[in-house]
């Protein structure tokens, strides 16, 4: 497994765990993800060292989560964030962050990696759902990036 794919999977684990803790405890998920990341870096409990790209993903998703969630709510036809499987929600947050806020990842790679994570870790229908939603955002990416630049994001 490529280094970035491993980093994405680890970031997915952290975002998913933070999301689940937020659902059960009522705390904001983005703050929990960064706090959970810091905790794991400080006390790794036998885990491999945290990859730099894992840190970048978690911090990036947390920094832009309000906008990412707004886009997901807007373009996920017939689905609210709460109704989506939690794994899909985390995968989509990573995918949207890579598409719109990370210039180092080619757009097609961001979509393909998100679909691969969905195929590996979620429901049978998830890869199609993730591909369709990220594909729609990919088509809108130039406009969305311009909006982010104009807003200072």
Curated annotation (Swiss-Prot):
Concerning NCBIfam families, the annotation shows:
nusB
One Gene Ontology molecular-function label: RNA binding
Q: Which GO terms describe its cellular component?
A: cytosol
InterPro entries given in the database record:
NusB-like_sf, NusB_fam, NusB_RsmB_TIM44
Q: Name one GO biological process term.
A: transcription antitermination
Concerning its family, UniProt says: Belongs to the NusB family.
Protein source organism = Beutenbergia cavernae (strain ATCC BAA-8 / DSM 12333 / CCUG 43141 / JCM 11478 / NBRC 16432 / NCIMB 13614 / HKI 0122)
Entry protein name: Transcription antitermination protein NusB
Keywords carried by this UniProt record: RNA-binding, Transcription, Transcription antitermination, Transcription regulation
Q: What does this protein do?
A: Involved in transcription antitermination. Required for transcription of ribosomal RNA (rRNA) genes. Binds specifically to the boxA antiterminator sequence of the ribosomal RNA (rrn) operons.
The cross-references to SUPFAM superfamilies, in alphabetical order and at most eight, read: NusB-like
